[in-house]
Amino acid sequence: MPPTVNMGIPGAASSVVERTAGKRVLLAEPRGYCAGVDRAVETVERALEKHGAPIYVRHEIVHNRYVVDTLAKAGAIFVEQTDEVPEGAIVVFSAHGVAPTVHVEAAARNLKTIDATCPLVTKVHNEAKRFARDDYDILLVGHEGHEEVVGTAGEAPDHVQVVDNPDAVDNVVVRDPNKVIWLSQTTLSVDETMETVRRLREKFPTLQDPPSDDICYATQNRQVAVKAMAPECELVIVVGSKNSSNSVRLVEVALGAGSRAAHLVDYAEDIDPAWLDGVTTVGVTSGASVPEILVRGVLDRLAEHGFDTVQPVTTANETLVFALPREIRPARA
């Protein structure tokens, strides 16, 4: 797996940061919203505009507290299970995807569904279906219980085993060691995933790779940007929610790449001034489900403590955009 994937996007470049005197912020680029999150959030906004409140959303549309609270104030109602949605109502499926059984449940309740599953998650679903049809054992590297993993595993429950971490490899048993493939959750740490795959391949030498990288371009790009700046930072602040897999991974990557400390915050107010004691360089990034307004709040908070020099660290240029679900696309003139 390459260290970063730009999906054919031109303009990717590495940025050299010149050292300045005094306190400074290194600001990772890219950061924040990915194409799948942007699409999912806009899907709920457009559904509210088109149909009016309430619009039901199965699970948090994306894993970010601010985004969910903002959409809830606009009229979105977030539920955990399909049977919480009134019969005949409109329901949006979150960016993380759902298992086929959820579509069946929705049809039984005569729900009008809008599927905001990220297309890169849908790609992994299709891979699971394809290899299950060919009777492979599918080893899904991912976090047990995460919505995305539940949805992908649900495509082929008799063929999929979830491998949560490198140590879980010891417990994996397959029917035919020559018909085994690994797939992964899209928001994992690249390094930890590769360690899990290395250990799987030690156990199953003919283990097949996915047709293309399952860890999404945005997850990889954000991790690469953090790796580029972390060695120069005494502290890295990751803006993101605790239930956001890709945001939590950024904290881990920052620590692994050399930052003395790294913390996850939802809001600027979550920053403890004690974190800044003796610090001259703070790195700032944000998870793929984080709107830029929250990053700006963090920069303002840091400026109050003398960190008013902001230097970008650019490792990729993202221009990818996904089309909205057909149910809420604007009508053609």
From Swiss-Prot:
Its cofactor is [4Fe-4S] cluster. Catalyzes the conversion of 1-hydroxy-2-methyl-2-(E)-butenyl 4-diphosphate (HMBPP) into a mixture of isopentenyl diphosphate (IPP) and dimethylallyl diphosphate (DMAPP). Acts in the terminal step of the DOXP/MEP pathway for isoprenoid precursor biosynthesis. Gene3D superfamilies: 3.40.50.11270, 4-hydroxy-3-methylbut-2-enyl diphosphate reductase, catalytic domain. This is 4-hydroxy-3-methylbut-2-enyl diphosphate reductase. Belongs to the IspH family. (2E)-4-hydroxy-3-methylbut-2-enyl diphosphate binds at H63, H96, H146, T186, S244, S245, N246, S289. It comes from the Bacteria. Pathway: Isoprenoid biosynthesis; dimethylallyl diphosphate biosynthesis; dimethylallyl diphosphate from (2E)-4-hydroxy-3-methylbutenyl diphosphate: step 1/1; Isoprenoid biosynthesis; isopentenyl diphosphate biosynthesis via DXP pathway; isopentenyl diphosphate from 1-deoxy-D-xylulose 5-phosphate: step 6/6. Binds 1 [4Fe-4S] cluster per subunit. [4Fe-4S] cluster binds at C34, C118, C216. Isopentenyl diphosphate binds at H63, H96, H146, S244, S245, N246, S289. The gene is ispH. One of its GO terms (biological process) is dimethylallyl diphosphate biosynthetic process. Pfam families: LYTB. It catalyses: isopentenyl diphosphate + 2 oxidized [2Fe-2S]-[ferredoxin] + H2O = (2E)-4-hydroxy-3-methylbut-2-enyl diphosphate + 2 reduced [2Fe-2S]-[ferredoxin] + 2 H(+); dimethylallyl diphosphate + 2 oxidized [2Fe-2S]-[ferredoxin] + H2O = (2E)-4-hydroxy-3-methylbut-2-enyl diphosphate + 2 reduced [2Fe-2S]-[ferredoxin] + 2 H(+).
